[in-house]
Amino acid sequence: MTVNLEEYFRTTFEDKLLVKMPEREDDHLTPATRLLEKRREMSEVEQALGAQKEEFQMKMESLQQRREELERKEYQLRESLLKFDKFLKENDSKRARALKKAQEERDMRRAKDCEIARLKEDTSGLMKGRDKVQHRLEKYIIYQQYLEKVLENAEEFQEIREIIARYDTLTATHQDLLERELKNQEKYEKEKARLIKFTEEKNNEILNYNNQLANLQTKLEKTQSVAVKWESQWTHIKNTAAKKTLLLGRIKMATHNLFMLVNRHLGQTGMVDMTDKQLDKIQVFIQDLTQITLDIKRAENAITASGANTAG
């Protein structure tokens, strides 16, 4: 336990540490007397403080002893609680085992009761079965008598069980023949259904092919009509192209002739194979010739006007 001594003295022994000072009657005392008085007061304060410290230390030791005693009692109490808890757990375990054993005995007794009831039901069922078998035996005794008479009159059988075995064989053969007939009938019905389905599918396919053939025939006729139309247009295009080709050849020939005339007029011998370049040169020549002609006409007009003015 941590103790703040300063806080303890301040809160607990504040009143005790206050020393009542005498009223101010020392105005007539000398400084030496006052110093002695102050030392005496300090000594009294230190004695009081020492006494308080001893008292505090004694209380702290008492508190420490009390705390140790409380811890010891707490440990003893905790040990007692652990022992008591262990005792309760052991009692609970014994009680649980006893309850479990009692429950197991009740379950076992209940199972035995159920088994007894089931055995009683089985016994009752067996008794009923025995009575039923006895009744059937009494009912079928006439068949045994009949088989005995058959055995007396039939030379091929020596015992009744031979007759029964022959009957079982004939019955099994008859049942086998019935099953074969049923399987054959089912197979026949399946094959018949498959044939009908196959015939319907083929008829549908033929009908579908006929429809497709009709559509293809219609498309063929349309295609042939379009082909005739396009063939006519192609012939027209070829004829038009031939005419335009002829015209283009004539234009190129005329352009070449004009180009040659321009070259001779200009005194040039250079050759140009491209028609568009030939046309460009011809255009420039015509523009120059036109400009020269205009200049000559303007000069003639000027001369005529000057002569008229002179005559006047």
UniProtKB/Swiss-Prot annotation:
Pfam family, one: DUF4200
Annotated coiled-coil segments of the chain: 34-121, 172-233
One annotated Gene Ontology cellular component of this protein: cytoskeleton
Source superkingdom: Eukaryota
Keyword GTP-binding among UniProt keywords: no
Protein family according to the UniProt entry: Belongs to the CFAP73 family.
InterPro entries documented for this protein: CFAP_domain-containing, DUF4200
Biological classification of the source: Eukaryota, Metazoa, Cnidaria, Anthozoa, Hexacorallia
UniProt name for this protein: Coiled-coil domain-containing protein 42 homolog
Keywords, in A-Z order: Coiled coil
Keyword Cell division: no
